[in-house]
A protein has these predicted regions:
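Long, charged/polar-rich coiled-coil alpha-helical scaffolds that serve as structural arms
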Residues: 63-73
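P-loop NTPase signaling cores
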Residues: 2-63, 94, 114-307
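Charged, amphipathic alpha-helical linker segments immediately N-terminal to NTP-binding catalytic cores
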Residues: 74-130
Length: 307
């Protein structure tokens, strides 16, 4: 029963005796043992590198997915707050006053749409007179973003002051497009205009959550839904900077292309702006453009009824 163990013991004794008696054999055994140890170390370090890489990847993925989940909660929280901030009212008591939340009182705007061509002047009212009035803004935006051609260019949403562009952005993020996309809203008023688009996204994430998550973490995280980035307030970026960032829409289109080339992902983009000064912007041919209409009597009545 103990024969194999005894054989190994005798082999080791003879092996060590040879190493003592013959220096060449001793050198050879050291070289061979060193090779074996080095091989084990290489395998060990490779495994450590793999484990560290897997950990970093999982950590990055977790950070990205947590950030997107935080954004989902953020936009839902915003549209579920009352349309009037009671804390800013000067009444002695507001106990009996109940205001509807933004989600409940939201009335989708009617709009007009066109495909941009170089000879079109978007600020000219006559341009929009030739376009039909539509009422299906949620479906229209969803269809445009999925379109193979227009979906590779940013969708431009225009409107007069008070047309509801920012609320529409939050409704798109929290409700209308939630099941189709992970949504991030970039407030251009607060960004550094000279930065690249990824840097502006990083800046927005840092301002919102300060969690160290970067755009590259999100782009590399293998999400189950595509990403939609809404750049809200192109006109405010222009006004705040004092410079003409007329190529900004083209920068966003290039950003979309780069994400496909670098990360193999399709990123959809929406840009909102007041119609003022929009003719100074460089807009690519075939870009989809929406003009939000001011509230008509029908929508005002519907809004008041909800209130």
């Amino acid at each position: 029963r103990g024969l194999p163990a005894k054989a190994v013991e005798n082999y080791e004794k003879q092996y060590y005796q040879l190493a003592i008696n013959f220096n060449d054999f001793f050198v050879w055994t050291n070289i061979e043992e060193h090779k074996k140890i080095q091989k084990k170390l290489d395998v060990g370090f490779s495994e450590i590198a793999r484990l560290v890489s897997d950990y970093c990847e999982k950590s990055s993925n977790s950070k990205a997915k947590n950030t997107l989940e935080q954004y989902r909660k953020k936009y839902n929280s915003y549209v579920d707050t009352p349309v009037v901030d009671v804390s800013e009212m000067n009444f002695c008591s507001t106990d009996e006053i109940i205001f509807p939340n933004k989600r409940h009182i939201f009335v989708p705007q009617s709009f007009k749409a066109l495909t941009y061509k170089n000879d079109i002047h978007l600020e000219n009212r006559d341009t929009w007179k030739m376009c039909d009035e539509r009422d299906d803004i949620g479906k229209f935006v969803s269809d445009i973003l999925r379109h193979s051609i227009t979906g590779s260019l940013p969708l431009l949403i225009l409107g007069n002051p008070g047309a509801g562009k920012s609320l529409l952005c939050n409704m798109l993020a929290a409700q209308i497009l939630y099941h189709e996309y992970h949504v991030i809203i970039i407030k251009l008023r607060d960004t550094v205009a000279e930065q690249t688009v990824p840097q502006q996204i990083n800046q927005q994430i840092e301002r919102d959550f300060s969690n160290g998550c970067l755009w590259s973490d999100i782009a590399e995280s293998g999400l189950n839904k595509p990403i939609l980035i809404i750049f809200d307030g192109y006109d405010e970026l222009l006004q705040a900077s004092g410079r003409s960032y007329s190529d900004y829409l083209q920068r966003i289109a290039e950003f979309q292309k780069q994400q496909k080339d670098i990360y193999g992902i399709f990123v959809k983009c929406i840009v909102t702006s007041r119609i003022t000064l929009i003719d100074k912007a460089l807009i690519s041919n075939n870009s989809p453009v929406i003009m939000l209409s001011d509230f008509d009597e029908k929508r005002i009545s519907q809004w008041c009824k909800i209130w």
